[in-house]
């Protein structure tokens, strides 16, 4: 035999060998025989962890988790829907995501362990297009019905103010943490960013760009979101977009919250501190 293999009686009453399963799999009963497999998971619930592996057939349990959020979002085995949404739990650790952006599918929720446990950053190198430095790309492209919560995001940079400094259309954007997915108009539920803190010198918290969609609400919702961006930008709604900010805070930003091109921001219990505009 081979190390780790198990002997058991088969359907003929003879002793047969059960080969050792993959790392993280467990020996369990399928009701008839013993088999190695993943721990049973809930429908449409997936996991990313620091000891995970980005490979097909994984993600369905914490013991067979994926290793990156981008891989998880790009390889969900079932397309999420309004009646059958997906949840991706991102366990404690720092995740350096390569070849941004992460395009979050419709009706998908990304949940970190908490602000002090799960951190998401851009990896070194270029973005998926191969021409922009990864940290000056966009971290998350959010689709209709998306929720992102309980994360700390760090590492984006590159916003350069223009003249006048209060006008973002005169400046140059660098790295952005949250933006709309051009391929997914907001027809049902706005992307909902909840309990998230972002850091970064010259980073931009969110750009809600209404010009990406010819229909839908062109909207995002931010609840308990803090942006700490020295000389950066907090949230920019542009070109007939809509943003709602509840208990949101920016610190040290060149511009805290701004709406241009017919856009609207509704802000409750929020503030911009120690910045310029």
Regions flagged by a language model, labelled:
Residues 147-240:
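Right-handed parallel beta-helix
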Residues 50-90:
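Acidic Gly/Asp/Thr-rich repetitive segments characteristic of extracellular carbohydrate-active
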Residues 33, 45, 85-87, 92-94, ...:
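Detector for repetitive beta-architecture
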Residues 1-44, 64:
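Extracellular repetitive beta-rich solenoid segments
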Residues 77-80, 96-111, 119-150, 154-187:
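Extracellular beta-strand-rich solenoid/capping regions of secreted or surface-exposed proteins
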Residues 117, 155, 199-201, 205, ...:
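Residues in short coils/turns that link rungs of repeat/solenoid architectures in beta-rich domains
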Residues 11-13, 31-33, 51-56, 93-96, ...:
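Acidic glycine-/aspartate-rich tracts in secreted/extracellular proteins
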Residues 17-19, 70-82, 95-105, 138-142, ...:
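Short, T/G/N/S-enriched strand-turn elements that build extracellular solenoid repeat scaffolds
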